[in-house]
Regions:
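N-terminal intrinsically disordered, low-complexity tails
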Residues: 1, 5-44
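Membrane-interacting alpha-helical segments
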Residues: 37-57, 121-123
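Amphipathic alpha-helical packing elements
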Residues: 50-111
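Asp/Glu-centered strand-loop micro-motifs enriched in Gly/Pro and often flanked by an aromatic residue
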Residues: 55-62, 75-76, 105-134, 146-149
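Non-heme di-metal
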Residues: 119-395
Length: 395
């Protein structure tokens, strides 16, 4: 089972003696294995992108590739240098799913039943969807309009294309839930303009999309490369790695109580996808640090820590807004410890010290939800290893 301590799913060692899923193989050239935070400190000896002079035409050498500021032909996928990116792409393809294959009949009946859910549970569902229906569109915009054009490793671009498609599937899933339940579409889809706790999170994210989407923005200097790196950290560690987890926990908690099981099943698939996106983003971040150690300055790390602290506060306010009273055996204060736990994990994964005193995961069952590589029946839907190699099976 993929656990929080194995969440990177790479062959790289985890910091602070957190073991990865498999033993680390030391690469023979410029990190062919996925990079770890501990391998990307200021003492890295890999050639900096600023002094790199790789050929721009002709046959590509794997050793000449760079994540950013590369000079090799981005249209030539092989030879691979970053095999971890290709492996994640293949794993994501194997986990393909579509929302309409999930049965929503029980959810519809429960939602229509006046006594099916409490008012607090209904508020939670609507606030939850209010954030997610547009969040994945923001993530997709960040990829297709921003970060994709600044990444110069074609195997990483290949994953980004798959990731953008999955963001579209997630938006489709939330729309499918909204439509199935007969919710007011304009209320839910415009929540990011009308609900302050949702709006605050989105306004935190938007500047990091806009800078990369600016057609005049180009990497190649310390300042612009740090701007790109900061945006990648915000989206991998804070959006996909933190801002989604209150919502995931809430809907999956409903599913654990045999409520809204169709929605919970889709959220479980989305959680699995987003865990892969987060891990890929962290690998890219660490590889950029390895290839460009001059970016990882003390001042820059202080800026990243400040962003982490702000994100924890924003997500905690969202938790308070979605559940002002205790519901489902959860309450907002429980999420304070959870968010600090996640923030510490993300910080360590990119080579920062923990931001908070030792925090434990108050929801260990969430670790089980990340992995679907086995027969499992969490929500009475009898899902059997949903992969394209074996179609979704309903008993």
């Amino acid at each position: 089972m993929l656990t929080w301590d194995q969440e990177n799913a790479t062959t790289a060692p985890m910091p602070n003696n957190m073991d990865a899923a498999t033993p680390h193989q030391v690469p023979t050239s410029a990190s062919q294995a996925a990079p770890s935070a501990s391998a990307t400190g200021a003492t890295a000896t890999t050639t900096s992108a600023y002094s790199m002079s790789a050929p721009s035409t002709g046959r590509v050498k794997a050793s000449d590739k760079r994540i950013i500021n590369g000079k090799t032909d981005v249209n030539q996928l092989v030879p691979f240098k970053y095999k971890w990116a290709w492996e994640k792409y293949l794993a994501s393809c194997a986990n393909h799913w579509m929302p309409q294959e999930v049965n929503m009949t029980r959810d519809i009946a429960l939602w229509k039943d006046p006594n099916g859910l409490t008012d607090d549970e209904r508020r939670l569902v609507k606030r939850n969807l209010g954030f997610f229906v547009t969040a994945d569109s923001l993530a997709a915009n960040n990829i297709v309009l921003g970060s994709y054009r600044h990444i110069t490793a074609p195997e990483c671009r290949q994953f980004l294309l798959r990731q953008a498609f999955e963001e579209a599937i997630h938006t489709h899933a939330y729309q499918y839930i909204v439509e199935s339940l007969g919710l007011d579409e304009s209320e839910i889809f415009n929540a990011y303009n009308e609900v302050e706790s949702i709006r605050a999170k989105d306004q935190f994210l938007i500047p990091y999309i806009e800078i990369l989407c600016d057609p005049t923005f180009k990497t190649g200097t310390i300042e612009t490369d740090q701007a790109l790196l900061k945006s990648l950290i915000v989206f991998a560690c804070l959006m996909e790695g933190m801002f989604f987890y209150v919502g995931f926990t809430q809907i999956l908690a409903l599913g654990r109580q045999n409520k809204m099981t169709g929605a919970a099943e889709q959220y479980q698939y989305i959680l699995r996808d987003e865990s892969m996106h987060c891990n890929f983003g962290i690998d890219v971040i660490n590889q950029i640090k390895l290839e460009n150690p001059a970016l990882w300055t003390a001042e820059f790390k202080d800026e990243i820590r400040a962003l982490f602290l702000e994100a924890v506060e924003l997500e905690y306010r969202y938790a308070e807004d979605t559940m002002p009273r205790g519901v489902l055996g959860l309450n907002a204060s429980m999420f304070k410890g959870y968010l600090r736990y996640i923030a510490n994990r993300r910080a360590q994964q990119i080579g920062l010290d923990p931001l908070f005193a030792s925090e434990e995961n108050p929801f260990p069952w969430m670790s089980e939800m990340i992995d679907l590589k086995k027969e499992r029946n969490f929500f009475e839907t009898r899902v059997i290893e949903y992969q394209t190699g074996g179609a979704l099976s309903w008993d």
